[in-house]
Amino acid sequence: MVRVFLLYNLFNSFLLCLVPKKLRVFFPPSWYIDDKNPPPPDESETESPVDLKRVFQMFDKNGDGRITKEELNDSLENLGIFMPDKDLIQMIQKMDANGDGCVDINEFESLYGSIVEEKEEGDMRDAFNVFDQDGDGFITVEELNSVMTSLGLKQGKTLECCKEMIMQVDEDGDGRVNYKEFLQMMKSGDFSNRS
């Protein structure tokens, strides 16, 4: 569960920085997660190079180490976000520090660093609300299972698996993840005992 939340948070932060406010939605990067090459279990930083690279690769479709306007457009369209060409150009320019018309991994990492510094409580609440489907302030086993299943993730396909994921972050032992637990998990750097 922690790994899914971390990748989700990285991807979501990137989209929040780029997509105009009226079009902002929250999408998990589940369809890009490579189960064959998982990151080492002892990673403890939310913005680890492995996770940042995975998010970058979501947009770098041809794997050349650069995100072009076309690749950004394709990725956003796959998420149901359709942007005018002029907005796509502005998005690339916002990230393109060296002026080559593309975004490389270093520019992406710099952008993410600034996003992390400016993270707002509202963004975290919106991310939490994706999983808290009934709006009662808790992520239950059933809600987690519903989200994980709808995303087509291998992790969390069974209620038992989701229960185990909940237990990993449930600090008060009530069998659910409340917003405080979610926020602490996302903002703390101590994921080594939960991964």
Swiss-Prot record:
MF terms in GO: calcium ion binding
GO annotation, cellular component aspect: endomembrane system; endosome membrane
Residue ranges of coiled coil: none
PROSITE patterns linked: EF_HAND_1, EF_HAND_2
Protein's name in the database: Calmodulin-like protein 4
Transmembrane segments: none
UniProt family annotation: Belongs to the calmodulin family.
Binding site for Ca(2+) 3: D132, D134, D136, E143
Domain EF-hand: 47-82, 83-118, 119-154, 157-192
One family name in Pfam for this protein: EF-hand_7
Biological function: Potential calcium sensor.
Binding site for Ca(2+) 1: D60, N62, D64, R66, E71
